[in-house]
């Protein structure tokens, strides 16, 4: 395989399991960490959209299937995590910046509206992509625009309106890598902001299995319902397939209890979908992304 000439690092047959919160999954055929945006653009231009591309963030809301990922898996590293101010007073944040890091930066700098990010695992890029939200706020409420690059190597900008935010999603082109996000700045009081962040952390600790190997919310909430309530009603609290189980603490969280496979987790989620539909007539939609190839040792649907 002839790979584009880059300044960054390639790794072949790279184990992705240790990068995910679930600690499951196969290897990346090729793993690439670009040095900067220009290095990424050079790779994409040289690639000419020949090799399949998968982007990878913090690994917090994802199941990588046991057969791994074909083509090139791109992970943006520390060089894409800067936080700064624009000339017009907005915040500009690299897409690999952790949500928690941005929340803490805003608290220290007395910027309000970002408190909810302390309760959302993952990166800014992933948060924008899925319009992540919690405690009454979503990314669409604070975002001005994004800077991105398409798989052909063209730099592009999208405003909040052009992104087309919807519940846990957007209408952006699929062949896009988010590089930076620009946010509104509203001044607040650091002590008040910290108090709200502490409230959110306390609520998470008491209601979510945050110390377990989990991937966050498994299913998006159907309109007018809470997924966890539907799962609980179907009698699935604590239900287990192999080493994968539904959390006893919060039914919309799956847990790897030690040696679960990606297949066991995905099979568990699909089983929950089926049983909730049989019980309530409501189809739950996955919020966790499932990517990669199914292992030849077993088939997984969905």
UniProtKB/Swiss-Prot annotation:
Ranges where the FAD-binding PCMH-type domain occurs: 23-188
Originating organism: Rickettsia bellii (strain RML369-C)
Cofactor(s) the protein requires to work: FAD
GO molecular function terms noted in the UniProt entry: FAD binding; UDP-N-acetylmuramate dehydrogenase activity
EC code: 1.3.1.98
SUPFAM superfamilies assigned: FAD-binding/transporter-associated domain-like, Uridine diphospho-N-Acetylenolpyruvylglucosamine reductase, MurB, C-terminal domain
Protein name (database record): UDP-N-acetylenolpyruvoylglucosamine reductase
Reaction catalyzed: UDP-N-acetyl-alpha-D-muramate + NADP(+) = UDP-N-acetyl-3-O-(1-carboxyvinyl)-alpha-D-glucosamine + NADPH + H(+)
Pfam families for the chain: FAD_binding_4, MurB_C
Function statement: Cell wall formation.
Disulfide bonds: none
Protein's cellular compartments: Cytoplasm
Entry annotated with the keyword Cell division: yes
Pathway(s) served: Cell wall biogenesis; peptidoglycan biosynthesis
InterPro entries: FAD-bd_PCMH, FAD-bd_PCMH-like_sf, FAD-bd_PCMH_sub1, FAD-bd_PCMH_sub2, MurB, MurB_C, MurB_C_sf, Oxid_FAD_bind_N
NCBIfam families: murB (TIGR00179), PRK13905.1 (NF010480)
PROSITE patterns listed in its UniProt record: FAD_PCMH
Catalytic residue positions: 168, 217, 287
Key words of the record: Cell cycle, Cell division, Cell shape, Cell wall biogenesis/degradation, Cytoplasm, FAD, Flavoprotein, NADP, Oxidoreductase, Peptidoglycan synthesis
This protein's GO CC annotations: cytosol
Family under the similarity heading: Belongs to the MurB family.
GO BP annotations, alphabetical order: cell division; cell wall organization; peptidoglycan biosynthetic process; regulation of cell shape
HAMAP family given in the database record: MurB (MF_00037)
Designated gene of the protein: murB
Location, primary (coarse class): cytoplasm
């Amino acid at each position: 395989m002839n790979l584009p000439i880059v300044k960054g690092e390639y790794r072949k047959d790279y184990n992705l399991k240790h990068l995910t919160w679930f600690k499951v999954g196969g290897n990346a055929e090729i793993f690439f960490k670009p040095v900067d945006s220009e290095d990424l653009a050079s790779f994409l231009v040289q690639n000419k959209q020949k090799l399949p591309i998968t982007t990878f963030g913090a690994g917090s809301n994802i199941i990588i299937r046991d057969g791994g990922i074909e083509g090139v898996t791109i992970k943006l590293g520390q060089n894409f995590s800067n936080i700064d101010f624009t000339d017009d007073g907005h915040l500009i944040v690299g897409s690999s910046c952790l949500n928690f890091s941005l929340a803490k930066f805003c608290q220290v700098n007395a910027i309000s509206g970002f408190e909810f990010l302390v309760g959302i695992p993952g990166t800014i890029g992933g948060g924008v992509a899925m319009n992540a939200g919690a405690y009454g706020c979503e990314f669409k409420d604070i975002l001005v625009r994004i800077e991105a690059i398409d798989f052909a190597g063209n730099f592009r900008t999208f405003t909040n309106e052009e992104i087309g935010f919807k519940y846990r999603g957007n209408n952006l082109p699929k062949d896009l890598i988010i590089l930076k996000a620009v946010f509104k700045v509203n001044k607040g009081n650091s002590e008040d902001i910290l108090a709200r962040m502490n409230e959110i952390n306390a609520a998470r600790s008491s209601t979510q299995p945050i110390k377990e190997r989990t991937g966050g919310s498994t299913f998006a909430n159907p309109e007018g319902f809470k997924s966890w309530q539907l799962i609980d009603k179907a009698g699935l609290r604590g239900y287990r397939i192999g080493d994968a189980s539904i959390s006893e603490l919060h039914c919309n969280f799956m847990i790897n209890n030690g040696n679960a496979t990606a297949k066991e987790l995905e099979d568990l989620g699909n089983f929950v979908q089926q049983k909730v539909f049989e019980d309530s007539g409501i189809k739950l939609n996955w919020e966790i992304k499932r990517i990669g190839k199914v292992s030849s040792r077993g088939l997984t649907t969905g």
